[in-house]
Design a protein with these regions (language model features):
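PRPP-associated nucleotide enzymes
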Residues: 1-331
């Protein structure tokens, strides 16, 4: 039985996908793309609110991929769930644990904007590493520099070109269409999208006096009579966004479309968008949105499943993500 232990082996580590409560539907879509089944994982809460996790089968020597968006009203529970599952995998001798986090919670707290503030995005990175996470896969971080908070590999994917393909299927006059950056910080990304679509770019200039509040001071670029595509990384309360939309309309913009990777949609955000003078608001399924694609709703959703699945495949098979033929998937 043991005579050949000294000989080289061609043992292939098995890939196993698991879903957290923050990405159940997206996890199913990713598994379907990969022709895999989601594996059994017990995730419960005790009566006092503490989280319990247990893998239903052995993960010894396996490549474990745990899919979890850290967003929504239970954002803290979802973060804790991720940490506990990572610890369970480490203690069960998994070969590696990759946290697939389509939406990275606390990403906006990436610097000290005022004195005596924390840098919570860095804290979350520290917690994930301490829990035993070996690799991160995420989509459209609020700030790309967050990758530098980690001492483990981070694959930063983008949904930008998924939006590009979505709008290319629209019957737009591209000579009369403009991509609008919601602020100066997104100007580079807006330029990438405008180049991909073959149209012009404009930039909104804002003043931000407090959290979740900003005032549009003006627009750099010509938007009068043009179809406008506003692109951002996330929509939270949508108050600032609706203010930008109103400003664009006052300046003579034509049809307005909104696109954002992460539809956080806090408070009255969905109601604000449904009543705003826009044609559509397109988000991805990085964060679940029950009203998206329902009849009569302006909220539309496209999936990042294939982009994420392709990344998982290339990580597992040790192929390059950026050179795999997946197109423009890595930011």
């Amino acid at each position: 039985m043991y005579e050949k232990l000294c000989e080289p082996t061609a043992y292939q580590k098995e890939i196993k996908l698991y879903a957290g409560h923050g990405a159940t539907e997206l996890s199913e879509r990713i598994a379907n793309v990969l022709h895999l089944q989601l594996q059994g994982l017990t995730l419960n809460q005790f009566a006092n609110g503490e989280i319990y996790a247990r893998f239903m089968e052995s993960v010894r020597g396996d490549e474990v991929f745990f899919i979890q968006s850290i967003a929504g009203k239970n954002v803290n529970d979802l973060l804790m769930e991720t940490l506990i599952v990572a610890d369970a995998a480490s203690r069960a001798s998994a070969a590696s644990f990759t946290a697939v986090i389509p939406h990275y919670g606390y990403a906006r707290q990436d610097r000290k904007a005022s004195s005596r503030e924390p840098i919570t995005a860095r804290l979350v990175a520290n917690l994930l590493e301490a829990a035993g996470v070996d690799r991160i896969i995420t989509v459209d971080l609020h700030s790309g520099q967050i990758q530098g908070f980690f001492d483990i590999p981070v694959t930063h994917l983008t949904a930008l070109y998924l939006f590009g393909d979505y709008f290319k299927n629209k019957d737009f006059d591209w000579n009369n269409t403009v991509v609008v950056s919601p602020d100066m910080g997104r100007a580079k990304v807006a330029k990438k999208l405008s180049d991909y679509l073959g149209c012009e770019v404009a930039i909104a200039h804002k003043s931000r006096p407090k959290h979740n509040a900003a005032e549009v001071m003006g627009i750099i670029g010509n938007i009068k009579g043009k179809t406008c595509i506003i692109n951002d990384d996330m929509i939270d309360t949508a108050g600032t966004l609706v203010g930008s939309i109103t400003k664009l309309k006052e300046m003579g913009a034509g049809d307005i479309y909104v696109s954002a990777t992460h539809g956080v949609f806090s408070g009255e955000a969905i109601s604000r968008l449904e009543n705003a003078p826009i044609v559509e608001c397109v988000v991805t399924d990085a964060i679940p949105c029950p009203v998206a694609n329902t009849p009569g709703s302006k909220i539309k959703s496209i999936t990042v499943a294939e982009t994420v699945a392709n990344c998982i495949y290339n990580v597992y098979t040790n192929h390059s993500v950026s050179e795999s033929g997946a197109g423009n998937s890595e930011m």
